[in-house]
């Protein structure tokens, strides 16, 4: 279904760029809704899952909160609060940073890794079921989105 049909737009868009931007926003919300619904089953928010993925990619090496923020998809998230919630669930550890006592090092625990593995199995299935794109089309879309952001 086209974006015009999805949002029941009767007038044409002012430009192709406007149409693309509206479509990206609409699709972002659609993806967020489906991913959030799945993550809720595990008691995680999309932002908490993002923190766990970032830490899991560190292969056991800790990161400071600021390093986590730099890598997050949602830069407006309160990373300290997210880490606190993950700490309460034993998904991460916090240790005072030896080089900077104002900072703290955060690392994923085995429980956090287990949670990631469980979620990823279902997320891969969800993403495969939602994607109507070939691998080539998905790569092209990713390149176009990078270009849209001027990257």
What is the predicted role of each segment?
Residues 1-12, 136-151:
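C-terminal regulatory/oligomerization modules of transcriptional regulators
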Residues 1-42:
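N-terminal leader segment of winged-helix/HTH proteins
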Residues 23, 50-54, 114, 140:
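Pre-recognition alpha-helix immediately N-terminal to the DNA-recognition helix
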Residues 33-75:
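N-terminal helix-turn-helix DNA-binding core of bacterial DNA-binding proteins
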Residues 65, 83-84:
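Short, hydrophobic-biased segments on the C-terminal half of alpha helices
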Residues 84-139:
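Charged, amphipathic alpha-helical coiled-coil/dimerization segments
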